[in-house]
Structure formats: structure tokens, C-alpha cells
């Protein structure tokens, strides 16, 4: 079971059909795969590269879907709202906002691909288990780790970090 990284993403695009495509993909739990597909097994295109084969954790991204996704997406699983790890999208005019969980880390490589495809991308993320958070806007990542009370106040409030760490501080004071 992974540590879950909480993510908030807002995208814009001049082409309404690109937002339609993103929203449909997100509702179908096939968001990243739609815009940044994982390579297929050359001998069986119905399978992902290395699917079903055992792999070494030190292998490169050319031999397994797992390594490829970590290198290119920034996380190992796709995102969406159908599986229960994301909320329904909110759309107003040319802007779409989603809130979702990803495994271990935010999908920063996916965000980079969206920018290449003409999206304006603004995101924030928080992983309470490893105590890191950040904001990402069109390629600029502001990353913070360590004590959450040293994070920017807007980020602390956005993810209500007091809910995650407040009880720990009370326990520390008792010791």
C-alpha cells in the first residue's frame, strides 16, 4: 500500500475539445494514459511493456511499465474519480479543476506533458507521511519538505495540514 499524495490541479486550454477530452479521461480513470500513454509490449500490444514479468527494482524505464511511469509520469498509477481516489471535476468556462490522490508522489511528469500539449497547468500537492508539499505552475516546481510549520501558510491552509499534524504536536508536548 503506498503513501497517498494529495493533489489539486487546475488546467486551462484555448481548445474546448482538449478540456472535454481531459474531463472524460478523468471520469474514466484513464487520465494520464490518455495524454501520455505507457509503451506497449512489442510482442503483444495488448500488454504494457514488461507487464506480467518480474522485474528488478534497479532496471531502467525501457523494460517495465513501472519504471517507465515513475520516470515519465512521476507516479506509478493513473488518476481519476471513478476509482474513489479522486473527487468529481469542477468546470467553469475554460477551466477544469480536480482533486485526486496519487501513489507516493505527484505526477509532475504528466503536468509537463500537459504544458507541451498547450494546457496552462497549476497544481499543488501534499504527502503527509513523508512530510513534503509543493506548488507547480507550468514547469516551475516549488518543493518543500521537513516541518510543515515551515511551509508557506497558503499551502498549509489549502491542505489543512493542522488536521494531519496537530495531534502529533500535542503528543510531542506530553512527552
Mark where each language-model region is:
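Long, contiguous binding/interaction regions
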Residues: 1-174
